[in-house]
UniProtKB/Swiss-Prot annotation:
This is Glycerol-3-phosphate dehydrogenase [NAD(P)+]. PROSITE patterns: NAD_G3PDH. Its EC number is 1.1.1.94. NADPH binds at F19, R40, R41, K113, A145, R260, V282, E283. GO terms for cellular component: cytosol. Sn-glycerol 3-phosphate binds at K113, G141, K196, D249, S259, R260, N261.
Amino acid sequence: MSGKSKSAPKIVVVGAGAFGTALSAVAAAKDKANVTLLARREEAAAECRRTGRNDAVLPGIPLPPGLVYSSQAAALEDADIVLFAMPSQAHRDAARSYGPAIGARAIVVTCAKGMEQSTGQLLTDVLEEELPGRRIGVLSGPGFAADIASGLPTAMVIAAPDTAIATELAEALSGRTFRLYPSADRTGVQLGGALKNVLAIACGIVEGAGLGDSARAALISRGLAEMSRFIVARGGEADTVRGLSGLGDLVLTATSHQSRNLRFGIALGKDGRAAAGSSELVEGAFAASVAARVAGALGIEMPVTEAVAAIVDGKLDVRSALEQLMSRPITHE
């Protein structure tokens, strides 16, 4: 990519969901942009070509005329930057499927906010396993797809171990109303995005159960403490927790009804427990299970996360979880 600094990098966004579409729209709005949105189904790509929109996920929002739509893996050939914008649990299969078409010099960026449930791995670790030799980054922070695609001011974080690469990515992907801050803390940025979804579910449960705003405030602050302990124990930086990908994303996701994780929690709070065999699990539901398991193995105290995991798994109802949290031994904050 550095060798093509005078021309626009070729960017391919894999995943034509709301977030992938929004990111492709921002990137394609720049001068001399070379951006392709890669959909899983040709029907989806064809509809975007026909209408200039992706009404299935972002109804009524026009997309830049220069944005290219495809469903063919060949679109990845010679890509400088590849954004993986599919759900966390689909990353490994997508990497295996598209990997042969991704060049050795490409930078691959995960844009999902979760961890792999079966292994507990960070998504960058999954991509490094499946795409050996590629440089891997992560994009995260407080940004809803509809806001980004509509041109509302949004700031997020892009992280890579090499700060020069993170800066290069930030410059390539930032737009007039979309600002990316580079970071070298790939671990902290990823875990902030995953754990804030868990805490958003907890805040939704509080809202759905009618427990009041004071309880929500307590969950946000105590949840932030849990997030910090977990991130630092996993090798991330405490400063990251206080930034956009930690506190910033937590505040947004735990307070806005645009958040699927918050809405999922509200439904849990109203019903008392998760529906058995629910197929509508959100990222935070998977992350809660993984984080609780890893925290137990590492001896990290995360009572809110453990309670969310137990409720989602149907092992505990909301009232019992609340009683457990409120009856914990009194300790210094």
